[in-house]
UniProtKB/Swiss-Prot annotation:
PANTHER family linked to this entry: LARGE RIBOSOMAL SUBUNIT PROTEIN BL17M, RIBOSOMAL PROTEIN L17
A GO molecular-function annotation: structural constituent of ribosome
Complex and partners: Part of the 50S ribosomal subunit. Contacts protein L32.
Pfam families hit by this protein: Ribosomal_L17
Identification of the protein by name: Large ribosomal subunit protein bL17
GO cellular component term, pick one: cytosolic large ribosomal subunit
Gene Ontology biological process terms from the UniProt entry: translation
Entry keyword set: Ribonucleoprotein, Ribosomal protein
Length: 133
């Protein structure tokens, strides 16, 4: 018997859940940090971590598997060109979940999901300011 294996249902149909996790995964890979509820963040981590592990070996088969799950060519390119090489030496644990308190409307626990070892936004702003001078 299965006994509760797989992802949480999150009070959604299977199609809605798949689409939501796919959209959240694309957003996380694009922006490298997103704010969401804590249960969604924990499920997102279970989906994103294997994708980054897949990107560490850039074969055609792995790119096709990534496209099958992401359905976004730009994110597949970013995954294999930037994120795969960035985490080449890390054996796992590519995401970090930080608790951010509770949402005002319904008191839902909120969390920030971010990729570890991501470039600092403040450093990019300083580099842009230095280049402008």
């Amino acid at each position: 018997m299965r006994h509760g294996h797989g992802l949480r249902k999150l009070n959604r149909t299977s199609e809605h859940r798949l689409a939501m996790l796919r959209n959240m995964m694309n957003s996380l890979l694009q922006h490298e940090a997103i704010k969401t509820t804590l249960p969604k963040a924990k499920e997102l981590r279970r989906v994103v971590e294997p994708m980054i592990t897949l990107a560490k070996t850039p074969t055609l088969a792995n790119k096709r598997l990534a496209f099958d799950r992401l359905r976004d060519r730009d994110m597949v390119v970013k995954l294999f060109a930037e994120l795969g090489p960035r985490y080449q030496t890390r054996p796992g644990g590519y995401t970090r979940i930080l608790k951010m308190g509770f949402r005002v409307g319904d008191n839902a626990p909120m969390a920030l999901v971010e990729l570890v070892d991501r470039p600092d936004v403040s450093e990019e702003i300083k580099d842009d300011a230095a280049a402008a001078k």
